[in-house]
From Swiss-Prot:
Lineage summary: Eukaryota, Metazoa, Chordata, Craniata, Vertebrata
Keyword Acyltransferase: no
GO biological process assignments: flagellated sperm motility; spermatogenesis
Cited InterPro entries: Ca-bd_spermatid (IPR026118)
Functional description taken from the UniProt entry: Calcium-binding protein. Essential for maintaining the structural integrity of the sperm flagella.
Modified residue annotations for Phosphoserine: 312, 344
Phosphothreonine modifications at: 280
UniProt source species: Bos taurus
Gene name of this polypeptide: CABS1
Keywords, comma-separated and alphabetical: Calcium, Cell projection, Cilium, Cytoplasm, Cytoplasmic vesicle, Flagellum, Membrane, Mitochondrion, Mitochondrion inner membrane, Phosphoprotein
Localization: Cytoplasm; Mitochondrion inner membrane; Cell projection, Cilium, Flagellum; Cytoplasmic vesicle, Secretory vesicle, Acrosome
GO cellular component entries: acrosomal vesicle; mitochondrial inner membrane; motile cilium; sperm principal piece
Single annotated GO MF: calcium ion binding
Disordered: annotated segments: 1-20
Recorded superkingdom: Eukaryota
Protein name from the UniProt record: Calcium-binding and spermatid-specific protein 1
Amino acid sequence: MAEDGLPKIYSHPPAESTKTTTEATIFFGADNTIPKSETTITSEGDHVTSVNDYMLENDFSTTTGNKLIPPKERQKSEDDVESHLEKEFATLMDIKNPMANESITENFLPVKTGNISSTDAISLIDFSTDIAKEDILLDTIDPGDKDVSLTSEVSGTPKESTAAIADTPILPNIMGKSDVSNYSSSVKFKVPADGNAHITDSSVPEAEITPTTERNLTTIPDITALTEEKITEIDLILPENDPNVVPKLTDSDEEKFITVFELTTTAERDKDNPEDALLTDEESTDEVSVWMERDMANEEESHSVLLTAVESRYDFVIPASVTMNLTEDLLTEEDLPENNRMESVTKNTDELSGTTPDLDAFSHKEDNFTTETGVFKLLKEEPDEFLI
């Protein structure tokens, strides 16, 4: 290489110009200076030898001279140089910006405030691992009146940039009161010299909680202890000796009674009404339509019987003379034999048939119907008491 930077020109040019190669090598020194690239071509007769396999040794220190080293030693020296450069580069970056590796972490810590179950969120701000000691402020969301200080020692490695702290602060607890909603705490961060991380949690006693009041349980009342309902019994039996006695009700006069007369006996009713009896499986499944027809027929028959009873109730009008004869005959029939008793019955029926009025004459006697001796007089009751 000439002094002016141009390559040297030899009198005999190289025989094989295609084998000529160039290489630019860049070195980074401790002073961050970049040397110039050099291209050297040597010639020994017709054979051209390049300097690509050799390089100048540079150990970033004062050297007495330059030596050519083989490729294996050169690779080893390059590895050493790279590791040395990384250390120096990291040192320079730490000096220029010492807070580059710092990070901010936020942790939400639950806070026990006496007997209140609500929690306060705490944010952890400006947590650094590169500084030996640093005070970290713990702020709560809702500021209050009182402050409580908490000191905890936490140690960690300077290589890691994040850390987590989970400590429960000590809060003053008053029985039945919990008015502390704000507190500030300073955490001292200490890094030991050996670089080992040890986390020490401060022991915090649990806040005492007032016991909850016991629930008042209501006992279920016993069914057998209920008071029995009062049932009023009314005796409506009339004395036989005095026909003028009117029954007196022991209950209030507002209550009304309905007298129901059954025209058929229980045996005939069960025979005429098959729906009262239990049905077999075949009747309930196969003969439903037949049962419905029977039900409709029975309803018509029952209604007809009731209507005839209501219409014919006013036809039984008996004069007073006939009633007196009936009572006398009934008393004498008890002493007569059976033959004479049958004759007296036929005689009484003939007299009744002769004294029974026609339907046309009944309309004229409708007004004085209640005054004559009829069905209601035989029952010793007034008609208004039974009709509603």
